Each structure stands twice: as structure tokens, then as C-alpha cells.
From Swiss-Prot:
The lineage of its organism: Eukaryota, Viridiplantae, Streptophyta, Embryophyta, Tracheophyta. This protein binds specifically to 23S rRNA. The globular domain of the protein is located near the polypeptide exit tunnel on the outside of the subunit, while an extended beta-hairpin is found that lines the wall of the exit tunnel in the center of the 70S ribosome. It is found in: Plastid, Chloroplast. The keyword Chloroplast applies. One of its GO terms (molecular function) is rRNA binding. The keyword Plastid applies. Keywords: Chloroplast, Plastid, Ribonucleoprotein, Ribosomal protein, RNA-binding, rRNA-binding. InterPro entries: Ribosomal_uL22, Ribosomal_uL22_bac/chlpt-type, Ribosomal_uL22_bac/org-type, Ribosomal_uL22_sf. One of its GO terms (biological process) is translation. This is Large ribosomal subunit protein uL22c. Its main location: plastid. GO terms for cellular component: chloroplast; large ribosomal subunit. The gene is rpl22. Part of the 50S ribosomal subunit. Belongs to the universal ribosomal protein uL22 family.
Length: 133
């Protein structure tokens, strides 16, 4: 189950946080490192073409953050870049797999928390015009 939390801190940044995603944090970091600092549209193309299972939850989070930006803040999706993307280790789900002769073998299923921050670069361009005049 993916639980998505949405936060807003600055007037030019939009957050989306996915918690308890059932995948290894190392595998999710491998994908996040590829998309950090890229534009929103370029990121969606990269994630659609990558052949990894970790791409789909990250794709959903980025899409959700962009929907937050356009609906809540009124930003254009073409002006968004991924300013911060991080993967943290979540809780470990522990289960028992039945074995022969009444024994049980523990299975550890790792989860991770992914946070995505999108930044609107058009606001920076407007501020730069006022600073250098």
C-alpha cells in the first residue's frame, strides 16, 4: 500500500511524500539518482523507458507532486524541475515462511519512504529581473 502525504512549505516548492513503499531503498535510490535535478517532462520520459520495478511508484509520486503544483499553486508543469528527491529506509515487515517439520523461516520485507520536491523555475527568472535592474 502506498500512502501519499502532500506538504507545502515555500511559495515556489511543492512536496509529495510516499511512505511504506514495498521495495528496497537501495533499488529506489538507483532510480532517484538518475532523475534528480531534471525537468518534470524529461523525468517522465526517463521513468517510462527504464525497465525497473521501482520506476512505477516514483512515477506516481512525481505525477502527484505535479498535480499538486498545478491545482494548489497554479504552476505550469513545463516550468517544474525536481530540486530534491530522497529515499529513506522505512520499517521492515517481518513474516514467517512455513518450513518442514513445523519450523518457520523469517522473511524480512524492506520498505522505503520517498520524498519528491518540485521547484518552479519561472519564479526565479522573475526575481532575477528585479534584482539586476
Amino acid at each position: 500500500m502506498i500512502k501519499i502525504k502532500k506538504r507545502k512549505r515555500n511559495t515556489y516548492e511543492v512536496y509529495a511524500l510516499g511512505q511504506h513503499i514495498c521495495m528496497s531503498p537501495h533499488k529506489a535510490r538507483r532510480i532517484i539518482d538518475q532523475i534528480r535535478g531534471r525537468s518534470y517532462e524529461e523525468t517522465l520520459m526517463i521513468l517510462e523507458l527504464m525497465p525497473y520495478r521501482a520506476c512505477y511508484p516514483i512515477f506516481k509520486l512525481i505525477y502527484s507532486a505535479a498535480a499538486n503544483a498545478s491545482h494548489n499553486m497554479g504552476f505550469n508543469e513545463a516550468n517544474l524541475i525536481i530540486s530534491k528527491a530522497e529515499v529513506n529506509e522505512g520499517t521492515t515487515v517481518k513474516k514467517l515462511k512455513p518450513q518442514a517439520r513445523g519450523r518457520g523461516y523469517p522473511i524480512k520485507r524492506s520498505t522505503c519512504h520517498i520524498s519528491i520536491v518540485l521547484k518552479n523555475i519561472s519564479l526565479y527568472e522573475e526575481y532575477d529581473e528585479y534584482i539586476y535592474i
